[in-house]
């Protein structure tokens, strides 16, 4: 059945009213009913008009039906959603509640952490509200940023003798416009000198990455060796690109395509004839140079749009890749059509527009086919790069969700896939946004992806073939910009794909640019400040 959406003003106003009435279950009576009132005790869900309590209820009751591990959740009376009210800010109460919901699944547990591994909730009224939280990076699904533009830092040496480098910069950001790139050494931020007391600067570095500093003066040395003093960076809104850089590198008589990608932003043109102004030129260039081997740099890529991941798979895949690409598997409640709470959610497309049938009926998420057959996706080759044989992925603990899906789904269809870096995040599950109180989007893990061989379940992360263990010379060397063949991870990847005299042996490079002696410290905050946005699905098939 063809999905249609309407942009007329009158119907749009009606849709807004419907979202308000349905999206957050805001009624004076108890709504929705528990999953199975005859079995589970539900005496504590009394009628209320309190908006926070209604949203508390909705968050739990949606999880009871759509959470991938919904069978682990207790009854309403045992969980008591309305007890999450101790914080002044409602969003913090809902985050606390969601965190406690996910504690019932061992897959969501992060030892010692006060946040869920996968689930999150955001306030859409906040600036860049569709981002997860301060613990995630600052580009939204359409590559709009609101920050200084620094992805993260890397620190090499000991706590008393170390150097700090910018590890990534978003294109067109304030940092990029000031000439700061990956490879820029930072020696001072404001009055805080950097290099001799690591513990004393962690708070300042984190403040930059968390947007707690709205403006700051930076001093240091640019990647080309040019010193700079008191360059002011101020948080601003900007249009960026998810592609850090791409190039063709010639080594050992072979052209290797290199591509550094920050997130799976929504396609510039989606639907049945997709295209993307950021990705298409990259792979056209690879095709024109006869590339058969790729290095795909996902070390700072925490996921994004599933549709974009599928499109990228179709750009990468050789012409021999046909048939099934992957499946999305939902829980039994959803597959059997028993997730009746989804009647409260108007079905939207990737841009948030409500979808209607050809007869004008507004679709809800209850109209979606959640079966395995309805959520199986197939190869449909895109672009002119048709002969890819070998791929090396550069990865880290911030490589998650759609990034891991890309790796898992291409494996059965090329000759060789190798990973260089540190273990990935481990997130084979995804979600779609649930609107609550016409204000909050809850992202509750609802499906798991499996490749064409039925492989998946990498909850513990993917372990690299060439592991950066801090001792073997393989290092995320932020002294070099993306695409520089001397950078540690890329140097290792090139030695795998196009070995020359120095080569690699047992996961070692013969030489890596020197870093200060001692332990290599990496500044982290809540998952390494990589934009762990998840694996977001916005395409759905209507039940027949």
PLM feature segments, named:
Residues 15, 141-145, 159, 226, ...:
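A generic structural signal for short, non-catalytic loop/turn and secondary-structure boundary residues
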Residues 21-24:
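C-terminal motif of bacterial Sec signal peptides marking the signal peptidase cleavage site
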Residues 26-294, 302, 308, 315-322, ...:
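Flexible, low-complexity junctional segments that flank or bridge functional domains
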Residues 259, 263-274, 280-293, 298, ...:
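C-terminal "post-core" interaction segments
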Residues 3-4, 138-143, 207-210, 248-250, ...:
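A general structural signal for short secondary-structure junctions and capping/turn motifs
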Residues 11, 52, 399:
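Aromatic-acidic/polar surface patches that form glycan- and anion
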Residues 1-13:
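Bacterial N-terminal signal peptides that target proteins for export
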């Amino acid at each position: 059945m063809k999905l249609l959406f309407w942009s007329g003003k009158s119907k749009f106003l009606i849709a807004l009213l419907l979202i308000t009435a349905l999206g957050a279950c805001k009624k004076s009576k108890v709504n929705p009913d528990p999953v199975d009132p005859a079995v589970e005790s539900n005496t504590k869900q009394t009628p209320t008009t309190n908006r926070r309590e209604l949203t508390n209820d909705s968050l739990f009751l949606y999880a009871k039906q759509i959470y991938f591990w919904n069978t682990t959740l207790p009854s309403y009376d045992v969980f008591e959603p309305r007890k999450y009210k101790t914080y002044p800010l409602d969003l913090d109460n809902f985050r606390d509640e969601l965190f406690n919901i996910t504690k019932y699944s061992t897959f969501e547990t992060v030892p010692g952490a006060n946040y869920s591994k996968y689930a999150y909730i955001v306030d859409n009224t906040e600036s860049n509200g569709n981002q997860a939280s301060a613990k995630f990076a600052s580009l939204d699904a359409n590559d709009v940023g609101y920050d200084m533009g620094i992805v993260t830092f890397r620190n090499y040496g000991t706590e008393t003798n170390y150097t700090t480098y910018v590890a990534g910069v978003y294109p067109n950001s304030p940092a990029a416009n000031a000439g700061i790139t990956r490879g820029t050494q930072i020696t001072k931020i404001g009055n805080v000198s950097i290099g001799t007391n690591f513990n004393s600067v962690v708070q300042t570095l984190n403040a930059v990455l968390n947007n707690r500093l709205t403006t700051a003066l930076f001093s240091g040395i640019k990647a080309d060796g040019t010193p700079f003093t008191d360059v002011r960076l101020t948080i601003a809104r900007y249009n960026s690109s998810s592609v850090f850089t791409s190039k063709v590198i010639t080594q050992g008589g072979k052209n290797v395509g290199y591509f550094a990608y920050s997130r799976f932003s929504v396609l510039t043109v989606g639907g049945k004839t997709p295209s993307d102004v950021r990705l298409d030129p990259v792979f056209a260039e690879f095709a024109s140079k006869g590339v058969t081997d790729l290095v795909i740099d996902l070390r700072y890529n925490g996921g994004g749009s599933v549709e974009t991941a599928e499109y990228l798979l179709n750009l990468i895949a050789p012409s021999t890749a046909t048939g099934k690409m992957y499946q999305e598997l939902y829980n039994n409640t959803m597959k059997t059509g028993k997730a009746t709470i989804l009647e409260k959610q108007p079905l939207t497309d990737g841009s948030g527009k409500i979808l209607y049938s050809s007869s004008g009926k507004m679709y809800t998420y209850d109209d979606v086919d959640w079966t395995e057959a309805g959520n199986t996706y197939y190869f449909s080759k895109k672009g002119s790069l048709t002969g890819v044989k070998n791929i090396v992925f550069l990865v880290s603990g911030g490589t998650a969700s759609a990034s891991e899906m890309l790796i898992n789904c291409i494996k059965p269809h090329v000759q060789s896939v190798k990973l260089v870096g540190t273990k990935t995040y481990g997130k084979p599950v995804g979600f779609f946004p649930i609107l609550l109180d016409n204000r909050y989007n809850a992202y509750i893990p609802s499906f798991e992806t499996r490749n064409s061989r039925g492989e998946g379940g990498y909850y513990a992360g993917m372990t690299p073939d060439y592991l950066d263990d801090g001792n073997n010379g393989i290092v995320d060397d932020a002294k070099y910009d993306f695409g520089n063949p001397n950078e540690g991870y890329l140097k290792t990847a090139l030695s795998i794909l196009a070995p020359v005299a120095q080569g690699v042996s047992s996961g070692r490079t013969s030489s890596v640019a020197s870093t200060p002696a001692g332990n290599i410290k990496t500044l982290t905050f809540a998952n390494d400040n990589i934009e762990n946005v998840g694996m977001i699905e916005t395409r759905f098939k209507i039940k027949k």
